C-alpha cells in the first residue's frame, strides 16, 4: 500500500544522479507513503523529508552516496515537538502516529553519515541497513534542534565494509524515550552511544573485526582469520598461534572501540551483547541499568586487556549478566564500589571471576 511509486518519477534528461527524482517523489507525497523499488540509486546531493512522507523501501533498494555531504537522508517532522500537541495549519490536531522509514540500504560510502531522524513523536524505523557512515550510521536528534521521542527502532543493521572510518558511531542519540530492539552494529568504532536518557535498548548486539588491521586487505585478513579459526575448531590453538595473531595486528575498527557508551541517565540495556571491543560498557550519568547482558572478547581478533565495564557514573545497576575471559587478560570492572549495585552476575571461570572482584573492589558478586 502506497501513495506514490518512485518509478513514476524518472530522471530528467539533464540529471546525472537519482537525488533530484527521489526528492521530487518525496515532495509529492506529504503525509503519505512513497514506495522505492529494488535498485541502486546514486545520491550526489542530500535528501530531505520535511513533509512527513513515509518511505517503504525494497530490502535491495540501495541509496549510495557518490559525493561528500552531511547525511544521505534526513527526516525532520518540521514542527515544534517540544510542545505537548502539534497542530496542522488549519488548527486541527496533527496526530498521525504511523509515520515510518522501512527497509532499504543506505550506503554512505565513507562520504557522509547515513540517516538523521529529528522532530517526531512515535516514529518507526525498521528493517534498514546503514553502511559506511563517515560519522554516524543512525543519528537521532543530533544538531537538528526540536525534539524526537518515542522512536521505535527495530532490526536496524549498521555495518562498515570499507577502511578509513575509524572513530565513527553506529547508532547515536541525544534524544529521550527511544526504544531500540534487535539492532546490530558491526565495525563502527562506537556501537551505540546515548547522550540523553530514558532510552531502552533491548537485544542489541555490537561486534567488530571483519575489517582488517591497517595495511592488510580484507581478503588477506579473512583468510588469516579462517586459518586460525580452524585451529580453534580442531583444538590445536597453541601459544604459537596466539603469538602469530598478536603480531598480525588489531583490526582497524576495534582499536579504542566501545560497544555501548551511556553518557546520560536512566538508560536500560536488557539482553544486550558487547561482543569484542576494547571497552564493552562505558557508563556515565546516573541510574543506568545493565541486565541480562554479556561481554565476550574473540581472541582471534587480537584484542587483549579488554574491559567489560568502565563505570564513571554516579549510580549503576548490573544484574543477571555473564562475562567471559577467553584470552586470560580481559578485565571485568573498573570503577568505584560505592556507585554500583551488583547482583546475580557470573563468569565462565567462576572462581577467577569471584577472586577478581574480591581483590580489585572488595566486592563479591
Model-derived regions: residue spans:
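Right-handed parallel beta-helix
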Residues: 92-187
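Glycine-rich, low-complexity segments
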Residues: 1-6, 349-365
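All-beta strand scaffolds that present successive hydrophobic residues in beta-strands
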Residues: 36, 54-58, 81, 94-102, ...
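Short glycine/acidic-rich loop motifs that flank beta-strands on beta-rich extracellular proteins
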Residues: 44-46, 59, 64-70, 109-115, ...
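Acidic Gly/Asp/Thr-rich repetitive segments characteristic of extracellular carbohydrate-active
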Residues: 6-37
Amino acid at each position: 500500500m502506497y501513495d506514490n511509486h518512485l518509478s513514476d518519477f524518472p530522471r530528467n534528461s539533464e540529471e546525472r544522479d537519482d537525488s533530484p527524482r527521489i526528492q521530487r517523489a518525496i515532495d509529492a507525497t506529504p503525509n503519505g507513503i512513497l514506495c522505492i523499488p529494488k535498485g541502486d540509486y546514486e545520491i550526489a546531493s542530500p535528501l530531505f523529508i520535511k513533509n512527513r512522507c513515509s518511505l517503504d523501501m525494497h530490502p535491495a533498494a540501495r541509496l549510495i552516496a557518490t559525493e561528500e555531504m552531511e547525511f544521505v537522508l534526513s527526516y525532520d517532522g518540521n514542527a515544534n515537538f517540544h510542545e505537548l500537541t502539534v497542530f496542522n495549519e488549519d488548527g486541527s490536531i496533527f496526530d498521525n502516529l504511523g509515520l515510518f522509514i522501512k527497509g532499504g540500504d543506505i550506503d554512505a560510502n565513507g562520504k557522509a553519515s547515513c540517516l538523521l531522524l529529528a522532530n517526531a513523536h512515535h516514529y518507526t524505523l525498521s528493517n534498514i541497513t546503514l553502511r559506511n557512515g563517515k560519522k554516524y550510521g543512525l543519528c537521532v536528534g543530533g544538531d537538528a534542534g526540536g525534539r524526537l521521542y518515542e522512536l521505535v527502532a527495530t532490526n536496524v543493521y549498521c555495518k562498515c565494509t570499507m577502511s578509513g572510518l575509524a572513530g565513527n558511531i553506529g547508532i547515536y542519540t541525544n534524544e529521550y524515550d527511544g526504544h531500540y530492539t534487535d539492532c546490530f552494529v558491526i565495525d563502527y568504532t562506537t556501537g551505540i552511544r546515548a547522550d540523553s536518557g530514558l532510552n531502552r535498548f533491548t537485544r542489541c548486539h555490537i561486534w567488530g573485526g571483519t575489517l582488517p588491521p591497517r595495511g592488510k586487505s580484507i581478503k588477506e585478513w579473512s583468510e588469516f582469520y579462517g586459518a586460525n579459526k580452524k585451529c580453534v575448531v580442531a583444538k590445536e590453538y597453541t601459544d604459537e598461534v596466539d603469538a602469530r595473531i598478536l603480531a598480525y595486528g588489531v583490526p582497524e575498527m576495534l582499536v579504542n572501540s566501545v560497544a555501548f557508551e551511556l553518557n546520560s541517565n536512566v538508560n536500560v540495556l536488557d539482553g544486550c551483547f558487547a561482543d569484542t571491543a576494547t571497552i564493552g560498557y562505558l557508563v556515565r550519568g546516573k541510574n543506568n541499568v545493565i541486565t541480562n547482558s554479556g561481554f565476550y572478547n574473540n581472541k582471534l581478533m587480537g584484542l587483549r586487556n579488554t574491559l567489560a565495564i568502565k563505570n564513571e557514573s554516579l549510580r549503576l545497576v548490573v544484574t543477571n549478566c555473564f562475562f567471559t575471559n577467553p584470552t586470560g587478560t580481559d578485565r571485568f570492572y573498573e570503577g568505584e564500589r560505592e556507585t554500583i549495585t551488583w547482583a546475580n552476575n557470573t563468569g565462565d571461570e567462576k572462581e577467577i571471576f569471584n577472586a577478581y572482584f574480591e581483590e580489585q573492589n572488595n566486592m563479591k558478586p
